[in-house]
Amino acid sequence: MKPLIELNNISYKYKNKKILKDINLKINEGEKIALIGKSGAGKTTLISILNGMKKQTNGDVKIYSKSFNNLDNSQKSKIGTIWQDLRLIDDLSAEQNVNCGLLCNQNLIFTLKNLLNISSFLKAHKCMDLCQLHSSIYSKNLKNISGGQKQRIAISRSIIQEPEILFADEPFNNLDPKLCNYLKNLFI
């Protein structure tokens, strides 16, 4: 069986400081793994390398048996990420933020017309419902909602893509234990 993701001798330096050194890992289709380490150990950096946001100093990342740089847009669109720092746009509504994940996934030009597409709103609402977000916040500006709601909006934005590969960087850190367990069960 060919691995879905393969890391060969991945290293990363930042300002001459080694953040990652000679990481080797193979993940087969259907497998779920967790990266566990202390704060500052490089977990977020590794996820940033895996999804193409950062370039490793040394080594090779293969996804679908190809170096990341050789993936086509269709393959890259099958990769989603939930970030610990959320990366939401405060001036947009909850549903518009969720739709951003769908629009970026399809390499569409980011326009107000695309954000107001009815079918994408319906899909966004399904994802937000799945993450137990009440319909009363769909059209609310992010400045007016809680941290836990923002966390679930970020999760909704990632799952709207229907990714085959989902990287999650502390995706439940702003949630109460009940919601955390509910969402963990969705992903496991």
Language-model features: locations:
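Catalytic Walker B motif of ABC-type/P-loop ATPase nucleotide-binding domains
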Residues: L166-D169
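The feature captures the beta-strand-to-loop junction immediately N-terminal to the Walker
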Residues: I36-K38
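Conserved ABC ATPase "signature" region
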Residues: L115-I137
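Helix-to-loop junction immediately C-terminal to a conserved catalytic motif
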Residues: N51
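Conserved ABC ATPase signature
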Residues: N141-I145, Q149
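Conserved catalytic motifs of ABC-family nucleotide-binding domains
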Residues: E162
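ABC ATPase NBD coupling module
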Residues: S67-W83, N117
